[in-house]
A protein has these predicted regions:
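Intrinsically disordered, low-complexity regions flanking the DNA-binding domain
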Residues: 180-181, 188-192
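Conserved alpha-helical positions within TPR/SEL1-like repeat arrays
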Residues: 52-59, 82-93, 116-126, 150-157, ...
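Structural marker of alpha-solenoid helical repeat scaffolds
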Residues: 76, 110, 144, 178-179
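Alpha-helical segment of the N-proximal tetratricopeptide repeat
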Residues: 41-82, 93
Length: 206
């Protein structure tokens, strides 16, 4: 009989992750890059900032003009993957899941190893109850960026939902290793819940 895993109240998934720095274009790790391609950048003469940098600054202040500047950055080919990713978060907060999905997938077209885009796409699939695809993207996010703590937490949630309790324990332990002790406490009750579920599962097989 399938078991229903009851999560503690604070075990809801962690939210979307905005890109806060410029990411370099995808490179082949096996190939020495002697001539790195320049990143397209059109500076605003008044502020000295590119469209992406202006958008990010406004976005972090909660200014609605950020959306317009992310679109401008994309048109100018300025940090396209990052701009698409952050625009996707804005669209998600506006309740436009389809547009958010389009933004995150476009980000991955420009940079298939964009950890934040994988993570945010995983969150969209999670909210749509497509836990299989959510798990794939959380796994990709943690693989691309092994220090991406939130990816491990959400991965553990999905793995627990998918009854892969052993893997969930590993992911949650990794999360606790990466965050300060205070933040790691939100995982304690979830760890206990997963351990109990794993024990019940083992006993049922005995």
């Amino acid at each position: 009989m399938a078991q229903i895993l009851k999560f503690p109240p604070q075990a809801s998934k962690l939210g979307f992750k905005r890109v806060r720095k410029r990411s370099r274009p995808t490179e082949n790790d096996d190939q020495l890059n002697l001539f790195p391609a320049p990143v397209a950048q059109i500076l605003n003469l008044e502020s000295g900032l590119s469209s992406f940098e202006q958008a990010l600054m406004l976005d972090e202040r909660g200014d609605l003009k950020a959306e317009e500047l992310y679109i401008k950055a994309i048109e100018e080919q300025d940090c396209v993957a990052d701009a698409c990713c952050n625009l996707g978060i804005i669209k998600s907060h506006q309740g436009d899941a389809l547009k958010a999905f389009d933004c995150f997938t476009t980000s991955l077209k420009h940079n298939p190893r964009h950890s934040e885009a994988h993570y945010n796409l995983g969150n969209l699939y999670f909210e749509a109850n497509d836990f299989r695809l959510a798990q794939i993207h959380f796994e990709m996010a943690s693989e691309v960026d092994p220090a991406f703590a939130n990816a491990y937490f959400n991965l553990a949630l999905v793995q627990a939902i998918n009854n892969d309790f052993s893997a969930a324990l590993v992911a949650l332990s990794k999360y606790q290793q990466l965050v300060p002790k205070e933040e790691g406490r939100i995982a304690e009750e979830l760890l206990q819940t997963i351990r109990k579920s794993l024990a019940v599962l083992k006993n049922s097989r005995a």
